[in-house]
Amino acid sequence: MLLKQLPQAVQQIRCISSATTAVTRLHRSVYCRLYPTVVVQPDGSTINIRYHEPRKIIKLPLDLSTLTDAERRARLEARKPRKKVKIMEEVEDNFNAKKYMKYIKKK
């Protein structure tokens, strides 16, 4: 009975709180400049969110303090850039110009 007497704007403000807005969905079919994105947590679970950049998947980093020493060392080694193998081409220079002097015509 009391809600019927209040104006419509006051009734809407009464329903908005930080708890309900975090739990409910967006009530718009198109939300400007936010893109559907999947967040993958370190344990493999996923969460669907809206993100300001057009990305499909965001993978959160793993906490290294929870790993064993061997796993931590293996992950840190995988992060380091790989060294490029330099290929040295050996050119055999056994060209002898005197061998071809007979083919040159003198004028």
Curated annotation (Swiss-Prot):
The entry's keywords: Developmental protein, Mitochondrion, Ribonucleoprotein, Ribosomal protein, Transit peptide
Gene Ontology terms: cellular component: mitochondrial large ribosomal subunit; mitochondrion
Where in the cell does this protein reside? Mitochondrion
Which GO BP terms sit in this record? mitochondrial translation; translation
Q: Does the keyword Ribonucleoprotein apply?
A: yes
Known Pfam families for this protein?
Mitoc_L55
The UniProt annotation puts the transit peptide over 1-16
Any idea what a deletion of this gene does? Flies do not grow after hatching, moved slowly and died as first instar larvae.
As annotated in Swiss-Prot or TrEMBL, what is the tissue specificity of this protein?
Ubiquitously expressed (at protein level).
Membrane-spanning segments:
none
Please state the protein's primary subcellular location. mitochondrion
Looking up InterPro entries in the UniProt record yields: Ribosomal_mL55, Ribosomal_mL55_sf
Asked if tRNA-binding is a keyword of the record, the answer is: no
> What GO molecular-function term can you cite, just one?
structural constituent of ribosome
Q: How does it assemble?
A: Component of the mitochondrial ribosome large subunit (39S) which comprises a 16S rRNA and about 50 distinct proteins.
Q: What does this protein do?
A: Involved in mitochondrial biogenesis and G2/M phase cell cycle progression.
According to its UniProt record, which protein family does this protein belong to?
A: Belongs to the mitochondrion-specific ribosomal protein mL55 family.
Name it.
Answer: Large ribosomal subunit protein mL55
Q: Which organism is it from?
A: Drosophila melanogaster
